[in-house]
């Protein structure tokens, strides 16, 4: 394969600057900053960059030896990636044993899948969403992207070796790579279902291959060790303009794109990959002014440690953020979390990643074994303390990964008991005095909040416009929150029909509603409580509301500590423009009321269920 003049560039500092930009975007996204709701696209930049750099290495190796030396390549990759991630997994499991035992049951499977770099498929097959989950998210969920990269490192060199041996035409080879990337992007479009959680297409190696292959394609036409530092003025201007536009587009995507926007999975992420190609091409070019900007020393420091930063930031954030505050970033907590991430990443870089990458596993452990950090009475006490510490760590890790610790059962019982207290009608009789006291205590706050709930511009004076219709039948359709309030709602609204289902999403309710056609009449009221389990489009919401266009609809908004909360509530607020729809504002009513929620921050305690029903019936009785 003919290539242009070689320039001596084994290290491109601006590439580390680009890594820094990508990892900062990802951290800001996981901290739930409103200005970085699209920060997840930083992972796409990492993918494109990996494809570019690895293919550069392999093509250079082929030019030298007409061989890819796959064994040496894979050993180098394992040295670079495995030690740090294995240490992180062990530390997270041990930390969870002591401080978050309730997550151990699910964490075991996540850890094993992460050890073998198949966590992305593990999350797909176990329906673990990247964008949402009730309760404390898995602290290992960020390892899905490393799983894809490791799978790429195993598969791509073998494919490339076949291509290089059998496809002699470089243009044809480039077309094959581009074609495979386009097939991956089309496959994502085919699999994606609007209004549903996009995690299947987001996690899948098959549906994310276009990111990596975009970088691979760039390596064929833009090898960084062939880029001349001297170019014509016009070419330099093109580089600078294209690079600036691509950076601005990346910033705009980071600030304004949401993970639930359908266009992302219908070509949007492919566009991000193309942006990544342009960013890499311009930032890596020595003639570009962006190359100098991204070689700024602080950016390079972050970039060289970006692997450790990416590894550690997510478990640190998830394990130190209260469930109810996941969508409410705290600037001081965020500063401490970022500081802890950088410190641990630096320790990992100095004492784990760099020594093993340079010296290999055997020499690293041999050197560790031969060093005596603490001598007492001519005895290597430090060595034995180190060995004892390693044994203790492995013992605790083994216990955490086994079923010996039954803490998960206790956590499950706690969550089950929450549901039982809100689902057993008999308990209401025993606790009648308590219920009355609770209602009296909340009466004043209910009045104030309920006035706010029903006097918003879209709902105001709806009942005054027409004579009040006598309601003779009511149906309530919802998810597991509806099951939480069911016994209290039945007591407050006699003869009500309640249809609650765990995990129900709005798209499911559209089908469910067809079975309740008799409630689409002027003397009927319909309560809709949906949005807890995922987002929906306004078209889907309108399809549901259209089925009850003659009935009086009470549409309850949601409080769920997940990213789609604001989008769901915005769609619900827009529906208030319909003359037969009244929005009931549970989001405002439950603000600051942590006692209303179970540990997962979504389902209701007894007090929460009672407050919910009191709010709902107050609005219905107006």
UniProtKB/Swiss-Prot annotation:
Subcellular location: Cell membrane; Secreted, Cell wall
Presence of the UniProt keyword Cell membrane in the record: yes
Membrane topology: Multi-pass membrane protein
EC number: 2.3.1.-
Domain of life assignment: Bacteria
Record key words, sorted: Acyltransferase, Antibiotic resistance, Cell membrane, Cell wall, Membrane, Secreted, Transferase, Transmembrane, Transmembrane helix, Virulence
Basic and acidic residues: bias regions: 425-461
Coiled-coil residues: none
The protein's enzyme class: transferase
Feature: compositional bias, Low complexity: 413-424
Functional note: Responsible for O-acetylation at the C6-hydroxyl group of N-acetylmuramyl residues, forming the corresponding N,6-O-diacetylmuramic acid of the peptidoglycan. O-acetylation of the peptidoglycan is the major determinant for lysozyme resistance. Critical for virulence and escape from innate immune response of the host. Involved at both early and later stages of listeriosis in the mouse model of infection. Required for successful host colonization and for intracellular survival of bacteria in macrophages of the infected host.
Family in the record: Belongs to the acyltransferase 3 family.
PANTHER family cross-referenced by the UniProt entry: ACETYLTRANSFERASE, ACYL_TRANSF_3 DOMAIN-CONTAINING PROTEIN
Protein name: Peptidoglycan O-acetyltransferase OatA
Species assigned in the record: Listeria monocytogenes serovar 1/2a (strain ATCC BAA-679 / EGD-e)
